[in-house]
Amino acid sequence: MSKVIFHVDVNSAFLSWTAVEKLKNGEDIDIRKVPSVIGGDEKSRHGVVLAKSTPAKKYGIVTGESLYHARKKCPNILVFPPRFDTYRKASESMMNLLKRFTPHIEKYSIDECFMDVTNDLRGMESVEFASIIKERIKNELGFTVNVGISTNRLLAKMASELNKPDKINTLYKHEIKDKMWPLPVGELFMVGKSMKRKLNELHIKTIGELAKYDVNILKAKFKSHGNMVWEYANGIDNSDISRYRDEIKCISNETTLSMDLTDTEKIHKILVTLCENLGQRLRDANKYCTSISVNIRTSDFRNYSHQKKLKNAVSSTRDIILYADKIFNEMWGREPIRLLGVQLSGLCSGSSVQISMFDEKTDTRNEILDKTLDSIRKKYGDNVIMRSVLLEKEEK
C-alpha cells in the first residue's frame, strides 16, 4: 500500500500569526486583508520584508526586499515588527492540534510539518481528511494553511506550493508530468540560486528538462547533490517521517547574522560557536547524537538543510564541528548567508552507544577534555577558554 503523506504549510506565517494576535487583543483591522508586511530590524538589517499580506503582494512587494523599496511601491503600507515569542506559541498550538490526527508528525520548520497519515484516514479519502485538518486549524487557531498530498515527503512539499493560499493540492506520480515538470527548475526543492544558475548553463530551464537529463553528467559535475536533484525532479524520495515526540528528540542552535556573509572563515567561526554550545547541551543531557544537520537561509530567504547520519553516536564537540563543517561545505553554493543553524538528532543515552575499538582512545580523550572544559566554563564563563579559531578573531 502506498503511503499518504501530508505537508502542512502556514500561509504567510509571521504575518498571519501577528494578525491573529492583534485580533485577539481587540484590534479591528485584520492586517491580512490590507497592504501590510512584517519588517525586520531597520537598524541592523535595513528593514527587510519578512512576510507580506496578499494585498501587499499585488503592489509587487516581495519577501526579502527592503522596507524602503516596499514603501516606494505602497506609501501607505502597514509595517509591524516580528514577534518571535508569538510565532513560537502559534507553532506549538498547531503541532498540538495536528497530534490529534496522527502521532506520525515531523516538524520541518516553525511554520511547516510533514504528517504520515497512511494508517489514520479512518476510511476517508486523503483530500477529505486534509480538508478537515485545514478547517480545524482555521476555525480553532485563526490562520490558514496549505496542505500538499502525495506518497512521499518531496512530492507533498512540492504539492503544497502549487496553489496558494488556503488550498489542498495533490501531486501523485502520475501528475508529475503535468503539474511539476513545466515549473522553472529553480522551484524544485533543494535547487538554490547557485544551482539554478549552473543548471541553466547546461540549458536546463524546467524541472522536466532536469528529470530527462543524463544523471551521470549531473553526478560528474555536482556529485551527490546532482543525483539528488535529478531524483527529486523525477519524484523520487525514500526518506521517512521522523515521528514527533514530546520528549527531547533533537538539540538545535541557530543564529540570524547581523549582515549577509560570504566569507568562509567568518562563517566557519560562527559554525564552531554554534557547535560548542550544542556539544555542551548534549553532554548536559547525558546524550549522544546519531545524526547532524546544517541549515542555512540565504539573503533571498531560501532555506536549505542537509543531514548526515553517523555510523557511531558522538558527543564530543570536535566531532560535531568536523561533521557540521563537512556538511556545510558540501551544501553551500556560495550564496550570501543570513541565517546559520546546526541540529543534533537521533539522540541516545550513553548506555546504548557503541564506540569503534579503533577510536576508543581518541574518543575517551575527547570526552574527558570536553567534560573538563564544560566544568571550567560553567564556573568561570563561556569565554574563559576558547578554541584557537575563535581566539584569532578576538586578536585581530
UniProtKB/Swiss-Prot annotation:
It comes from the Bacteria. GO terms for cellular component: cytosol. Mg(2+) binds at residues 9, 111. The active site is at residue 112. Its EC number is 2.7.7.7. It is found in: Cytoplasm. GO terms for molecular function: damaged DNA binding; DNA-directed DNA polymerase activity; magnesium ion binding. SUPFAM superfamilies: DNA/RNA polymerases, Lesion bypass DNA polymerase (Y-family), little finger domain. InterPro entries: DNA/RNA_pol_sf, DNA_pol_Y-fam_lit_finger_sf, DNA_pol_Y-fam_little_finger, DNA_polymerase-Y, DNApol_IV, IMS_HHH_1, Rev_trsase/Diguanyl_cyclase, UmuC. The record marks 14 as: Substrate discrimination. It holds the Pfam family IMS. Its cofactor is Mg(2+). The keyword Chloroplast does not apply. Gene3D superfamilies: 3.30.70.270, 3.40.1170.60, 5' to 3' exonuclease, C-terminal subdomain, DNA polymerase, Y-family, little finger domain. Residues 5-192 form the UmuC domain. It catalyses: DNA(n) + a 2'-deoxyribonucleoside 5'-triphosphate = DNA(n+1) + diphosphate. Belongs to the DNA polymerase type-Y family. Monomer. Poorly processive, error-prone DNA polymerase involved in untargeted mutagenesis. Copies undamaged DNA at stalled replication forks, which arise in vivo from mismatched or misaligned primer ends. These misaligned primers can be extended by PolIV. Exhibits no 3'-5' exonuclease (proofreading) activity. May be involved in translesional synthesis, in conjunction with the beta clamp from PolIII. This is DNA polymerase IV.
